[in-house]
């Protein structure tokens, strides 16, 4: 089955929520997001917030990033970040633990754009091809990103030119990663 990015992300999120509910009887929970407002919050308790994804309500895309850097981002990057509001979601890919970065609220969307601008400015300064991060991994110096030139999903080290291709495109990557309830 072929998915576009929005469909693949929605499908992964469904699988992620189902796994949480099967294992705990509750929606996904996060202690990191406790106390931070979001329309995703279903309930709070014991220092955690229980959440479910919501449709992204802002009709803009990552236009602030594009304007700030005079760059055109891959449609897949826009679609990834404006499909839904959700908590970050742990997953695995070929034995590698990762956490998909998600937008939690409208305020978080502003912060995300600022962080993407900083990331892209650093890459430009170091003369690296532009990428947009989509997931963190256990190593603080490495991340999973989408190459803005090719649309490939890559593993990259911050500030380094070496990159490992993980998937031909973001929709395919989201379709094969496996949800996890913890890292």
Where on the chain are the PLM-derived regions?
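Short acidic-glycine loop/turn motifs at beta-strand connectors
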Residues: 147-150
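A recognition module on extended beta-rich or small alphabeta surfaces enriched in W/G with H and D/E
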Residues: 135, 141-143, 155-183
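A surface-exposed partner-binding patch
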Residues: 1-140
């Amino acid at each position: 089955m072929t998915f576009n990015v929005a469909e693949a992300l929605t499908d992964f999120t469904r699988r992620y929520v189902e796994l949480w509910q099967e294992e705990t009887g509750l929606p996904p929970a996060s202690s990191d997001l406790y106390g931070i407002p979001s329309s995703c919050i279903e309930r709070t308790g014991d220092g955690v917030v229980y959440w479910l994804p919501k449709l992204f309500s802002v009709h803009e895309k990552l236009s602030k990033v594009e304007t700030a850097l005079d760059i055109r981002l891959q449609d897949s990057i826009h679609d990834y970040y404006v499909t839904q509001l959700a908590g970050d979601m742990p997953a695995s890919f070929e034995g590698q633990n990762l956490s998909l970065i998600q937008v939690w609220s409208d305020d978080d969307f502003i912060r995300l754009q600022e962080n993407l601008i900083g990331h892209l400015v650093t890459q430009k300064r170091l003369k690296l091809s532009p990428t947009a991060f989509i997931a963190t991994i256990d190593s603080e110096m490495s991340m999973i990103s989408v190459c803005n030139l090719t649309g490939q999903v890559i593993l990259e080290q911050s500030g380094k030119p070496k990159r490992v291709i993980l998937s031909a495109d973001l929709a395919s990557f989201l379709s094969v990663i496996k949800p996890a309830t913890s890292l």
